[in-house]
């Protein structure tokens, strides 16, 4: 019998080949256990509100008024909403062509893009053009749009850091391109060695692959490191020499938990370097409302800014964006509020600062608690989370555990994470889902569980790990191939 169009066997092979570990086997098993009544702690996704982070008050007030503009005509509105929230709601409604239910320009509302440009100028000290900023349904959609323009076929390669966020591997696979890995150095706090980049490019070219772009994730996901200014300079010189477009995933730029290495944007470093390099390197920078102290993942708000991209290429990207008509308009309002929050003297300023600082300070404490907790466990080592929302400990698995995983038909770190899930309800992501060096095993967990629950979670992990290591202990120690 002949196959129908959507029978599994006749599906697009790119769809079948792409994998997304963050919602893979572990997540599916966790969902099954939850249906059976087991308490599950979903630390597999950087989803702050799902783990109890409270929304910031001011942006929710503004968007509520935008969603229900009839409230603005109520004579009692000033008794419920502060005057600055009312004023901002009127401002954003005036930017639309018919409220939040009307399509915007396919690049996003011009007024919001102007606010994003002003934010970038304040952050970096260099001009930003609203015409080169596109608002998107989360940063992920922007990444997919740009990769779609870069990848022409299977012989086009994208340099991606390993460990990497599987958005990149999945999208590259879906678009029919080739992922070219470059490995971060765990012993150097997940630093980047440009020599490794050169080797990766040379190896790819020897296989007939044309490397066209490089991805950096700063701060890192899943690794949690912040790139130094010197490292970013090296990367930009490398991209200039190799004529690569640099994709700067900077969605965690608010999530910084130490003072020694602040976030520095790729654009600022590029502009600081001056001509000719500042005029040569093609750069796309991404940001979102989903991370930081906002954590508005479900709103799906993001943007990308283009630097040194030719006008005709910008027109083509605009054309492709137009196919989807309009990004989510309420999310565009959230983006405007993120880049232009209450200012000193505004009625809502003190509350906004209190809420945002409280979230960041708590995340900093949780990052330390989780790192210290992992490092107190047998056969577990973990670099401190400098930024982002994750810990990425290395699990030194005994050879007996590796053999047991093989017999069960599982990758060793998947085997470990499944056992952890079954025993404790903690849902993590195995390091193999992000890529890692051969014979080395990790897991990724968010640092997002409520601060008051963190000691119990880490105690539960330690108890499980001690029992696991005792059960599979052998005379050969752990794997460090």
Curated annotation (Swiss-Prot):
Residue list for modification N6-(pyridoxal phosphate)lysine: 291
One annotated GO biological process: biosynthetic process
Database matches in Pfam families: Aminotran_1_2
Give the Enzyme Commission number.
2.6.1.4, 2.6.1.2, 2.6.1.44, 2.6.1.-
User: In what tissue types does this protein appear?
Assistant: Expressed at low levels in seedlings, leaves, flowers, roots, and green siliques.
Q: Please indicate the residue ranges that the annotation assigns to the motif Peroxisomal targeting signal.
A: 479-481
Its pathway is:
Photosynthesis; C4 acid pathway; Amino-acid degradation; L-alanine degradation via transaminase pathway; pyruvate from L-alanine: step 1/1
InterPro entries tied to this protein: ALAT1/2-like, Aminotransferase_I/II_large, PyrdxlP-dep_Trfase, PyrdxlP-dep_Trfase_major, PyrdxlP-dep_Trfase_small
Keyword line = Aminotransferase, Peroxisome, Pyridoxal phosphate, Transferase
Listed cofactors: pyridoxal 5'-phosphate
Q: Where in the cell is it found?
A: Peroxisome
Gene Ontology, cellular component aspect: chloroplast; chloroplast stroma; cytosol; mitochondrion; peroxisome
Question: Which catalysed reactions does the entry list for this protein?
Answer: L-alanine + 2-oxoglutarate = pyruvate + L-glutamate; glyoxylate + L-alanine = glycine + pyruvate; glycine + 2-oxoglutarate = glyoxylate + L-glutamate
PTM (free text): The N-terminus is blocked.
Q: Name the Gene3D superfamilies on file.
A: 1.10.287.1970, Aspartate Aminotransferase, domain 1, Type I PLP-dependent aspartate aminotransferase-like (Major domain)
Select a single GO molecular function from the record's annotations and give it: pyridoxal phosphate binding
Q: What is its main location?
A: other
Q: What does this protein do?
A: Catalyzes the Glu:glyoxylate aminotransferase (GGT), Ala:glyoxylate aminotransferase (AGT), Ala:2-oxoglutarate aminotransferase (AKT) and Glu:pyruvate aminotransferase (GPT) reactions in peroxisomes.
**Family, per entry:** Belongs to the class-I pyridoxal-phosphate-dependent aminotransferase family. Alanine aminotransferase subfamily.
The record's section on PANTHER family has:
ALANINE AMINOTRANSFERASE, GLUTAMATE--GLYOXYLATE AMINOTRANSFERASE 2
- Subunit description: Homodimer.
Protein name per UniProt: Glutamate--glyoxylate aminotransferase 2
Q: Which organism is it from?
A: Arabidopsis thaliana (Mouse-ear cress)
């Amino acid at each position: 019998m002949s196959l129908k169009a959507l029978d599994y066997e006749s599906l697009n092979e790119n769809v079948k080949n792409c994998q997304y570990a963050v919602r893979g086997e572990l997540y599916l098993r966790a969902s099954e256990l939850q249906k059976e009544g087991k308490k599950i702690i979903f630390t597999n996704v950087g989803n702050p509100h799902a783990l109890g982070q409270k929304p910031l008050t001011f942006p929710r007030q503004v968007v509520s008024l935008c969603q229900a503009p009839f409230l603005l005509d109520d004579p009692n509105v000033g008794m419920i909403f502060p005057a600055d929230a009312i004023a901002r709601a009127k401002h954003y409604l005036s930017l639309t062509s018919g409220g939040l239910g009307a399509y915007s320009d396919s690049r996003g509302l011009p007024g919001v893009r102007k606010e994003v440009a002003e934010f970038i100028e304040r952050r970096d000290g260099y001009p930003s053009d609203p015409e080169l900023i596109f608002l998107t349904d989360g940063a992920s959609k922007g990444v997919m749009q740009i990769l779609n323009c870069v990848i022409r076929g299977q012989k086009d390669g994208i340099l991606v850091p390993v460990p990497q966020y599987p958005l990149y591997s999945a999208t590259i696979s879906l678009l029919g391109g080739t992922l070219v890995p470059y490995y971060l150095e765990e012993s150097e706090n997940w630093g980047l060695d440009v020599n490794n980049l050169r080797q990766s490019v040379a190896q790819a070219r020897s296989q007939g692959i044309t490397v066209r772009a490089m991805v950096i994730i700063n701060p890192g996901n899943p690794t949690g490191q912040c790139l130094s200014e010197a490292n970013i300079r090296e990367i930009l010189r490398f991209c200039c020499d190799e004529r690569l477009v640099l994709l700067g995933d900077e969605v965690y730029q608010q999530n910084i938990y130490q003072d020694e290495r602040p976030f520095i944007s790729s654009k600022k470093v590029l502009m600081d370097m001056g001509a000719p390099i500042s005029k040569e390197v093609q750069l796309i920078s991404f940001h979102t409302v989903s991370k930081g102290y906002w954590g508005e993942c479900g709103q799906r708000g993001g943007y990308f800014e283009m630097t040194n991209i030719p006008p005709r290429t910008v027109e083509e990207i605009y054309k492709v964006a137009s196919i989807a008509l309009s990004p989510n308009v309420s999310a565009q309002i959230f983006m405007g509020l993120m880049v232009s929050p209450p200012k000193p003297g505004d009625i809502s300023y003190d509350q906004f600062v209190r809420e945002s600082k409280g979230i960041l300070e708590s995340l900093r404490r949780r990052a330390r608690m989780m790192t210290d907790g992992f490092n107190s466990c047998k056969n577990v080592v973990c670099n401190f989370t400098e930024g982002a929302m994750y810990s990425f400990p290395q699990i030194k698995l005994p050879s007996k555990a590796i053999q047991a995983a093989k017999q069960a038909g599982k990758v060793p770190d998947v085997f470990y994470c499944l056992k952890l899930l079954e025993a404790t309800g903690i849902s993590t992501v195995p390091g193999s889902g992000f890529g890692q060096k051969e014979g080395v095993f990790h897991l990724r967990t968010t640092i997002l569980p409520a601060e008051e629950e963190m000691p119990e979670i880490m105690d539960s992990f330690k108890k499980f790990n001690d029992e696991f290591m005792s059960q599979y202990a052998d005379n050969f120690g752990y794997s460090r191939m």
